[in-house]
């Protein structure tokens, strides 16, 4: 079925649907967009996105038929780009990649805990994203893959239930969008607001920091605690 998935992915690519978050409302991958990384969400922890059901129904049907697939997207990385070392702090899932349109070259690869894997069309890999990993595309060709979060197998039913509950809460709070009329989770809304606030006041804050460095060091952690409390009440209160 990978050719069917690739056909729908490349149609979205050609039409410009695989793109960065235009409103800075994707907290999980905000730093990736600076590197030219782009995505189109298929499913995010509770159900498929309406835009995905309309634009790539065959892939959505395939992904939805596998209960352990919690999140799925098409992910793009342009030639000559890279993603810095990072890791997922929540160990509730494993990461799955299926090569769709790749350079088919060892120069386009991912490093997971020091081990290399180069993507190839039609070939897949699964890894533990809690290990530090990073990506290099040292070719001139854009890489497009199917990117999935797979529920992590755990040793007991209790741990599995806890994992599913936590994943469901995080999934709702981080709900993404492909199109403007789709719902955005609270964490992503807060991230977008913080980006707008930061962009608006960064110059003023930098000037104030230079003039009052000691007071800035005192107030910064206090402000961070206040923001966390407000965010917690907004999301869970």
Task: Annotate each language-model stretch with its function.
Residues 83-86, 108-110, 127, 133-139:
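Short beta-strand His + acidic residue motifs that chelate non-heme Fe in jelly-roll/DSBH
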Residues 1-87, 93, 105-108, 144, ...:
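Fe(II)/2-oxoglutarate oxygenase catalytic core
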Residues 128-129, 150, 160-163:
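C-terminal, beta-strand-rich globular interaction domains
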Residues 118-132:
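Conserved metal-binding segment of the jelly-roll/cupin
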Residues 95-98, 126, 141-156:
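A short hydrophobic beta-strand segment most commonly corresponding to one strand
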């Amino acid at each position: 079925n990978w050719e069917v998935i690739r056909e729908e992915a490349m149609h979205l690519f050609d039409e410009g649907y695989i793109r960065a978050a235009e409103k800075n409302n994707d907290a999980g991958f905000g730093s990736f967009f600076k590197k030219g990384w782009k995505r189109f969400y298929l499913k995010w922890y509770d159900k498929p996105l309406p835009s995905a059901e309309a634009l790539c129904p065959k892939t959505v049907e395939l992904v939805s038929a596998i209960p352990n697939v919690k999140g799925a997207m098409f992910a793009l990385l342009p030639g000559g780009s890279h993603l810095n070392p990072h890791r997922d702090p929540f160990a509730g899932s494993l990461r799955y990649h299926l090569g769709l349109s790749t350079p088919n070259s060892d120069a386009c690869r991912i490093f997971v805990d020091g081990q290399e894997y180069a993507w190839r069309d039609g070939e897949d890999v699964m890894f533990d994203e809690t290990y530090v990993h990073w990506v290099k595309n040292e070719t001139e060709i854009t890489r497009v893959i199917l990117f999935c979060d797979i529920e992590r197998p755990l040793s007991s039913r209790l741990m599995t239930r806890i994992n599913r509950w936590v994943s469901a809460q995080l999934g709702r709070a981080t709900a993404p969008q492909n199109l403007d009329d789709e719902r955005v989770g609270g964490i992503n809304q807060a991230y977008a607001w913080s980006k707008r606030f930061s962009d608006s006041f960064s110059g003023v804050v930098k000037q104030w920091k230079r003039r009052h460095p000691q007071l800035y060091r005192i107030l910064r952690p206090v402000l961070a605690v206040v923001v966390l409390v407000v965010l917690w009440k907004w999301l869970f209160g």
